[in-house]
């Protein structure tokens, strides 16, 4: 405490000492205090309110700070997305408090906390006149040391302007808002990004060129499903879908922002993304409630550790609402708004479109513009793909992170799935390979056995696959579109596959011999997965091919292995007795030194898992 400090303060108030325990301490500058006191629309963290309360006792005449309340019903300091928020109106301090505070050099802490890869949200009150969606520009620059990143904000209705930030790095961060509206410009604050909790592994990213991993390095083995508009079916059905997902093996779900008009899906959504009514929407005015609900469902998925693969545009409108034929200006405004709202959610992936080539009002140049816009406006660089109908998009474009492909034929036979890897040099996700079901359309009536077969084909090729289900239902609720409950037999078998994937090498499974033994994948020479598919042999000669150059080390004489027989349909694991020791057979294979074979049950859908014994 500086000498000569007025006796009205004395020592640091007890409440302030307690609130600061364990927090990083920083010296509050004169400029910061001036901003805190005079700025009627400033921002503050939840903890700022906590430590500012004891200051009321410093001067008897100091009124309580007036906290700006939100009209929303959730608890102060949190919004429906469960994120830390910052909101405070500080102009309640009188001049006496100002003099005391300016005379002090207390190392006060004004920071809030958010997990690394979590979401920190700044909310300010701002203009409501005119059209805030068009008239007001709002963003914030977040900084740590010499590094900074500018994040676009958005208008959320009722005078609320928000900007959301997901810190990549732990430690102290600061921010300053940027706006053409005086009351929103130049507001500053700080917070601390803390160690992530046990279930927070960060966003999923590309790893080892063809695979995925969370930001903390934990492997992510994609096992997705499709449920196009489950999020627009009302709370009862949506909660049922979430309950089903919680018990499923799926760790990614594809779904749309816009409503869908298609067979078995002709009901109107509970609300619309824009102000107005069908065929008479004002696309310059968004409906914040619509997007708040979308965010709620994204967070629900995050709690289930499921990635949200969000389809931004689609052709299933047919003029019902006109969202498939918006102008370039309307598209761009909408896309910027969605990215500003959702990019900070760590489980978000972007899909520019479902069956992009079926959108007859868009050209290839439009998609290039849209891809660059979404990529360029996303400060957190979430995964981004574009899904095809009959014509593959140019998946080599630099803004595409992974190839999202519809092609059932690619996984219907051995040796096909890996070809796209060579062409695109990116992770290959067969998001649509037809659907398990019994509807008349040829894309919607493959068997559960065929669905599981296609997943395994994708797996041994070093690629990934997507599930869907279209069983007829009197209530018109088909999983592929509306969600609800799963009726098919493939999910249980895919859960078995998930256990196999979880036990596989972290680097990902690679094809081992695409020229000859295409049913073998793995990570040579330590792990092999042999999938025999629809064949039903009674034995398999134990022999391991050498991998392609650069795809692992070749097997060598003396290496020892164990083996297990996996029944991928009946979901059983049977260990094989003994140890297999390698001896060179020819220029391409090493086989068991005693020429042993593995006995098999003579049924289809059998796999063999082979693991090297470390010596």
Describe the function of each predicted region.
Residues 145-152, 570-578:
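Surface-exposed loop/edge segments in extracytoplasmic proteins
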């Amino acid at each position: 405490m500086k000498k000569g400090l007025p006796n009205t303060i004395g020592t640091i108030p007890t409440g302030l000492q307690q609130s600061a325990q364990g927090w990083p301490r920083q010296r509050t500058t004169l400029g910061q205090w001036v901003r805190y006191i005079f700025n009627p629309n400033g921002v503050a963290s939840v903890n700022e309110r906590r430590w500012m309360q004891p200051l009321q006792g410093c001067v008897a005449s100091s009124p309580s700070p007036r906290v700006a309340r939100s009209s929303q019903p959730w608890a102060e300091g949190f919004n429906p997305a469960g994120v830390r928020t910052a909101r405070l109106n500080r102009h309640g301090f009188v001049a006496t408090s100002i003099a005391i505070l300016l005379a002090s050099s207390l190392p006060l802490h004004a920071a809030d906390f958010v997990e690394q890869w979590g979401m920190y949200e700044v909310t300010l009150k701002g203009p409501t006149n005119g059209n805030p969606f068009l008239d007001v520009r709002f963003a914030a620059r977040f900084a740590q040391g010499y590094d900074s990143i500018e994040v676009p904000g958005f208008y959320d209705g009722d005078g609320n302007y928000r900007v959301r930030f997901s810190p990549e790095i732990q430690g102290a961060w600061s921010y300053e808002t940027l706006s053409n509206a005086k009351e929103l410009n130049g507001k500053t604050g700080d917070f601390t990004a803390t160690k992530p909790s046990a279930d927070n592994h960060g966003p999923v990213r590309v790893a080892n060129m063809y695979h995925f991993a969370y930001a903390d390095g934990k492997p992510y083995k994609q096992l997705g499903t499709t449920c196009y508009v489950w999020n627009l079916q009302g709370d009862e059905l949506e909660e049922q879908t979430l309950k089903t997902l919680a018990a499923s093996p799926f760790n990614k779900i594809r779904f749309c922002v816009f409503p869908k008009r298609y067979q078995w899906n002709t009901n109107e959504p509970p609300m619309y993304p824009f102000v107005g009514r069908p065929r008479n929407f004002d696309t310059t005015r968004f409906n914040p409630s619509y997007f708040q609900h979308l965010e709620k469902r994204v967070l629900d998925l995050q709690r289930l550790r499921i990635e949200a693969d969000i389809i931004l545009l689609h052709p299933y409108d047919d003029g019902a609402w006109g969202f498939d034929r918006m102008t370039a200006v309307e598209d761009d405004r909408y896309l910027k708004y969605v990215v500003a709202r959702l990019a900070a959610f760590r489980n978000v992936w972007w899909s520019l479109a479902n069956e992009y080539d079926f959108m007859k009002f868009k050209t290839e140049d439009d998609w290039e513009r849209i891809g660059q816009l979404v990529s360029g406006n996303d400060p957190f660089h979430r995964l981004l793909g574009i899904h095809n109908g009959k014509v593959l998009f140019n998946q080599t474009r630099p803004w595409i992170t992974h190839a999202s492909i519809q092609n059932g034929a690619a996984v219907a036979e051995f040796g096909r799935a890996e070809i796209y890897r060579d062409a695109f040099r990116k992770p290959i996700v067969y998001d649509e390979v037809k659907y398990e079901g019994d509807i008349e359309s040829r894309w919607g009536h493959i068997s559960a056995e065929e669905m599981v077969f296609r997943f395994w084909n994708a797996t041994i090729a070093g690629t990934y696959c997507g599930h869907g289900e279209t069983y007829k239902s009197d209530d018109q609720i088909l999983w592929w579109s509306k969600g609800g409950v799963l009726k098919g037999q493939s999910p249980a078998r895919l859960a078995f596959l998930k256990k196999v994937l979880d036990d596989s090498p972290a680097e990902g499974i690679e094809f081992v011999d695409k020229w000859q033994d295409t049913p073998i994948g793995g990570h040579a020479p330590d792990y092999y997965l042999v999938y025999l598919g629809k064949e039903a042999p009674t034995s398999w000669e134990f022999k391991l091919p050498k991998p392609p150059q650069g795809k692992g080390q070749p097997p060598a004489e003396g290496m020892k292995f164990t083996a297990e027989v996996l029944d991928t349909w009946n979901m059983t694991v049977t260990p094989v007795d003994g140890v297999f020791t390698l001896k060179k057979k020819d220029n391409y294979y090493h086989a068991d030194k005693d020429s042993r074979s593995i006995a098999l049950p003579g049924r289809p859908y059998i796999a063999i898992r082979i693991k090297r014994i470390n010596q």
